[in-house]
């Protein structure tokens, strides 16, 4: 690294633009969470082994996770290393669908201006685990809200958003638009679905409008007929069409299900669920003999399609699945087993024993001393996967016909297979010397994750749930979690047991930054009022205030400590950064800028400090005299919200901006080397692993992404090469080179 004096002489206050066009894509290694706001965005692959879902501008094709035995902790999230990430969109994905046999995936996006592409991906014949882009359909502007494949995989229907307001039918194999038509006036369209027995007829529905579209291949014309709903005015959010194309089920925002008889295009029945659910019907999926309804309140409702009352639908049960709305429901296409009949215990081998078992089973069910799921017919049992708006993935079992009662039902319990943070993440942190796990904080929740598998190992929820965790960090023992809250308290927890160790009440108006001093002896914290305070910790159970320092006039956004803990740096919204003498409890130097400083980091060499803020400038400072070493401007018109410097070499600088992308800079060159794909929501925190091989990003939707650091990967490869050469030449000495943990090296993910 160049010295501070050399850097000042060469680049002092000389703004320069980084070369964004030459940057490569930052390789995504793994991710937790998905874009739950995309309607019907979660899909099961027809092979029954994989799932397909959107994550920002990326499509993830990953193995199905296995259920956990704990409500809050997932055991086996699936083999994340074998997940495939499909990149190609310039904006956030807003619609996703998969064809019946899994050959094609179609995805669409939202862009701020210009053409919103629809991309068709085809399964790679040579590598079945991945897809490749085969068609890019570019006719819609700004936004695409819904997509649907025909049953034979030959046709694709797409619906544009409010600024586009067009319905277009495509030929999947040639990529040409067969025909397009404006959306009928009277409301926006939210959903589309093809009829099962036709590749030229589909249904669209939305705000006060339901239309049946037909494509005339002879005249090359797309025409529509409005379905007669009588006097009903409903905002329709979801569509499901039965196997015989007789009925279309339309889920509404008013918790009603409209049943349309398709041959005559008339409303047959209106089935209300207002007594059981709230916030509308967000998703509908057909299952054998039943209709599954996902509601905005997070509940799953089972309706029988074999009603005995003469009606088309009959209410069976309603189960709470998630804390947020169910936007996707996917049902396994095959039952859990092809062996029909009641599953008997191993001891029931004779007909008498089986009849006796059935008799006592029915008696237990009638007296409520047993649950229906204790008696199973696996040939009638299907797995139902529910995706929520907050990115949770849950599984529940559906029985199409119970072997004793003959009714359809939902089995207990609900298995939470995978979950994002659950609330918007405000902070992410690694232990000082251990990259095996990390912690996130946001809302009333704190989670500790395993880095390799991205599985949640522990969860802490603070009451009341209206509280918000604003900052989080590990103390130097790597076991104690420090958290700052909007009620003005500092709370410390044991990482393993989640036990509350100590609380500093009234520490600040709102605790916005917190760090632990060496040896778990103290804590330094910053608040929304601008005070910096030092705390003494005794035996990890008592905390007392030692000093309070006031230099900032506004919120302190970040605190960074030097290695000896005798100096600290703070960044504030008042446009100043202050270097503090912790021993003397006094300011050493300060540097000012016309910005809100949002983030800072100290280079491992401790001769430079890097700051970023709302003025889009990245600034290198000398902590000795607060002089500017280098300033660069981000070329995009977006505020900088988070940064971190890789350790231990300090070769890479990660910057997160309000455009929802992370840019990786070479520290010495100040050039952008890699840039991430777009996140589904705003990025709130970035953190390098202690070994510098991974970069973690967290966002406001609760998702976490793990990126490989290419600079560190290539450095390890170079070190291995040098080691190999010295072995061959006989010059190898174990004391000459640092050891390289080859097994822990991050491998760049295979391109889609």
Language model segments and positions:
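A short helix->beta-strand "capping" segment at the edge of beta-propeller domains
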Residues: 21-37, 78-83, 131, 410-414
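Terminal intrinsically disordered, low-complexity extensions flanking WD-repeat/beta-propeller proteins
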Residues: 35, 680-682, 690, 702-752
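WD40 beta-propeller blade core
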Residues: 60-61, 119, 166-168, 211, ...
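Loop/turn segments within WD40 beta-propeller blades
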Residues: 43-47, 98-102, 148-153, 193-199, ...
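WD40/WD-repeat beta-propeller blade N-cap
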Residues: 33-36, 87-93, 138-144, 182-189, ...
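Conserved strand-to-loop turn within each blade of WD40 beta-propeller repeats
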Residues: 55, 108-114, 159-163, 205-207, ...
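Hydrophobic beta-strand positions that form the internal "hydrophobic ladder"
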Residues: 51, 105, 156, 201-202, ...
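Short loop/turn segments that connect beta-strands within beta-propeller blades
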Residues: 65, 123-126, 172-175, 216-218, ...
């Amino acid at each position: 690294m160049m010295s501070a004096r050399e850097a000042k002489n060469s680049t002092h206050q000389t703004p320069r633009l980084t070369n964004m066009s030459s940057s490569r894509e930052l390789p995504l290694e793994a991710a937790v969470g998905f874009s739950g706001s995309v309607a019907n965005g979660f899909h099961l692959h027809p092979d029954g082994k994989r799932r397909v879902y959107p994550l920002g501008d990326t499509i993830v094709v990953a193995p199905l996770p296995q259920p956990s035995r704990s409500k809050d902790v997932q055991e086996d999230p699936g083999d994340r290393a074998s997940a495939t990430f499909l990149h190609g969109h310039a904006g956030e994905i807003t619609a996703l669908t998969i064809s019946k046999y899994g050959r094609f995936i179609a995805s669409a996006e939202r862009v701020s201006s210009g053409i919103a592409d629809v991309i068709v991906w085809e399964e790679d014949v040579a590598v079945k685990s991945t897809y490749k882009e085969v068609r890019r359909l570019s006719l819609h502007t700004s936004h695409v809200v819904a997509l649907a494949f025909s049953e034979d995989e030959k046709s694709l229907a797409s619906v544009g958003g409010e600024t586009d307001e067009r319905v277009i039918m495509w030929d999947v194999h040639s990529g040409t638009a067969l025909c397009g038509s404006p959306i009928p006036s009277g409301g926006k369209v939210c959903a589309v679905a093809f009829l099962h027995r036709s590749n030229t007829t589909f249904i669209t529905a939305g705000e006060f409008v339901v239309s049946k579209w037909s494509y005339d291949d002879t005249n090359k014309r797309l025409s529509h007929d409005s379905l007669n709903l009588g006097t009903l005015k409903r905002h329709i959010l979801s569509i499901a069409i039965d196997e015989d194309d007789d009925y279309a089920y339309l889920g509404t925002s008013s918790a009603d299900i409209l049943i349309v008889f398709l041959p005559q295009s008339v409303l047959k029945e209106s089935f209300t669920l207002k007594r059981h659910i709230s916030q509308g019907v967000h998703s509908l999926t057909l299952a054998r003999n039943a209709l599954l309804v996902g509601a905005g309140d997070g509940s799953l409702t089972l309706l029988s399609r074999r009603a005995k009352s003469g009606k088309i639908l009959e209410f069976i049960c309603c189960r709470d699945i998630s804390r947020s709305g169910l936007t996707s429901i996917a049902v396994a296409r095959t039952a859990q087993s092809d062996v029909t009949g009641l599953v008997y215990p191993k001891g029931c081998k004779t007909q008498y024993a089986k009849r006796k078992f059935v008799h006592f089973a029915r008696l237990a069910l009638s007296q409520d001393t047993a649950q229906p799921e204790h008696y199973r017919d696996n040939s009638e049992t299907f797995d139902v996967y529910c995706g929520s708006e907050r990115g949770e993935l849950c599984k529940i079992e559906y029985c199409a016909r119970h072997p004793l009662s003959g009714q359809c039902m939902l089995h207990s319990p609900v298995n939470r297979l995978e979950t994002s943070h659950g609330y918007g993440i405000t902070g992410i942190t690694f232990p000082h010397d251990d990259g095996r796990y990390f912690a996130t904080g946001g809302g009333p929740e704190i989670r500790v994750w395993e880095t390799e598998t991205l599985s949640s190992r522990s969860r802490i929820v603070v009451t009341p749930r209206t509280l918000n965790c604003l900052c989080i960090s590990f103390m130097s023992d790597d076991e104690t979690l420090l958290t700052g809250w909007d009620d003005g308290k500092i709370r410390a927890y044991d990482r393993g047991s989640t036990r509350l160790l100590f609380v500093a009440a009234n520490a600040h108006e709102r605790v916005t930054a917190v760090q632990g001093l060496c040896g778990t002896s103290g804590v330094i914290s910053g608040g929304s009022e601008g005070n910096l305070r030092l705390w003494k910790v005794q035996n990890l159970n008592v905390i007392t205030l030692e000093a309070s320092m006031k230099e900032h006039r506004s919120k302190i956004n970040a605190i960074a400590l030097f290695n000896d803990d005798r100096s600290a740096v703070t960044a504030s919204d008042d446009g100043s950064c202050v270097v503090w003498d912790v021993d003397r409890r006094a300011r050493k130097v300060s540097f000012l800028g016309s910005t809100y400083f949002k983030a800072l980091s100290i280079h491992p060499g401790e001769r430079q400090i890097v700051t970023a803020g709302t003025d889009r400038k990245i600034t290198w400072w000398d902590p000795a005299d607060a002089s500017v070493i280098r300033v660069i401007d981000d070329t995009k018109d977006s505020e900088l919200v988070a940064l971190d410097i890789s350790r231990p070499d300090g070769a890479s600088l990660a910057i997160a901006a309000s455009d929802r992308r992370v840019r990786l800079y070479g520290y010495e060159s100040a050039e952008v080397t890699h840039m991430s794909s777009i996140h589904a929501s705003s990025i709130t925190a970035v953190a390098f692993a202690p070994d510098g091989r991974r970069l973690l990003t967290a966002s406001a939707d609760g998702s976490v992404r793990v990126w490989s650091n290419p600079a560190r990967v290539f450095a390890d490869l170079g070190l291995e090469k040098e080691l190999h050469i010295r072995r061959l030449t006989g010059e190898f000495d174990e004391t000459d080179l640092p050891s390289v943990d080859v097994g822990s090296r991050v491998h760049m993910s295979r391109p889609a």
